[in-house]
């Protein structure tokens, strides 16, 4: 379900994105710009994500899993209100976290992050993340995972709910349909962005 790109505002400014999509669950929305310069220069993937937490004290998160279409291995960005203000942190969602053996703690991730920003209005949480893309990569296919939870304690997000809306979402989006692509590129022309909800 495509959405208009003209009504996206972040930090008081209108933002232009090549693509926008309403996700199938949790009233979440994602918009992105994929900028590929040439074969020898790094490109960028700019991602705007907005979701609604179950409560003002809750969290919203999304991430990319470089290893497959699954929750375990997701390199995540989770945002919430903290005592020091609106916060967005990185989390490596390991198999131990998925299994409930280990808590979800802020950790470095494998993605090359250029910048992160967040704005929160009540329970609505918007994030803006810019990632750097390696020019030697042979595919621009990524797996996107998202979810939300009702509370955060000591900067550790609590587990999300287990309703059907929390557990079931799957779609595919062609990142390159409206991307800024050079005339000569090694990137796959049929790359897909796959989305799946975040089941703990």
Language-model region placement:
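Extracellular-facing/secreted segment signature in eukaryotic proteins
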Residues: 1-199
């Amino acid at each position: 379900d495509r959405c208009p790109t003209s009504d996206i505002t972040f930090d008081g400014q209108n933002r232009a994105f090549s693509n926008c999509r309403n996700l199938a669950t949790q009233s979440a929305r994602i918009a992105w710009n994929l900028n590929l310069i040439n074969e020898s220069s790094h490109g960028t993937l700019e991602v705007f994500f907005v979701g609604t937490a179950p409560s003002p004290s809750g969290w919203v998160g999304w991430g990319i899993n470089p290893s497959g279409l699954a929750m375990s291995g997701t390199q995540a960005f989770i945002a919430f209100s903290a005592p020091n203000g609106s916060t967005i942190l990185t989390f490596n969602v390991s198999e131990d976290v998925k299994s409930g053996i280990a808590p979800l703690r802020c950790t470095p991730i494998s993605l090359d992050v250029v910048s992160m920003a967040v704005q929160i209005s009540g329970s609505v949480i918007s994030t803006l993340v810019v990632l750097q893309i390696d020019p030697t990569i042979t595919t621009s296919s990524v797996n996107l995972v998202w979810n939300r939870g009702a509370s955060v304690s000591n900067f550790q997000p609590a587990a999300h709910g287990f309703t059907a809306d929390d557990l079931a979402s799957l779609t595919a989006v062609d990142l390159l349909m409206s991307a800024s692509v050079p005339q000569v590129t090694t990137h796959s022309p049929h790359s897909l962005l796959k989305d799946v909800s975040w089941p703990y």
